[in-house]
Amino acid sequence: MSSSSDPITAAVAGASGYAGGEVCRLLHAHPNISLRTVCASSSVGDPLSAHQPHLHGIGEYVLAPTDATTLSGHDVVFLALPHGHSAELAARLPEQTLVLDLAADHRLSSSESWERWYGGSHVAPWPYGLPELAGARAKLTGARRIAVPGCYPTAAIL
């Protein structure tokens, strides 16, 4: 991780989609974060502005391949990929990298629930990134892998 005086380096996988674009917008505006890499498998080589024309100041970024080689070397990686695509990629990222998964791949603790709602194989759950839940803050402390809650559960829980 960067020293306290250096900005935190960030990468966003799935930057061409809605959630990835919002993450890019928020990171670009953050004074202590340097957005270094944006990825989108189906749009490699496109400027970010081709998919996110509203993102002024970072539209010239070129979309890179969504793979572990491209994403490694950043302090934090945001995975804004379709459900079922984050788990394999996250498993190939260095353990010291903070990874936040916006998909459902690591949200559910029950294999039965995962298979019912999403299909496919279930992977191990990560701490749920909603510190307002009882006991969640302690699980998040020091975690290097975090499952970002979706909008519906967040609204229902809060």
Segment roles from a protein language model:
Residues 1-158:
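N-terminal Rossmann-like NAD(P) cofactor-binding subdomain of oxidoreductases
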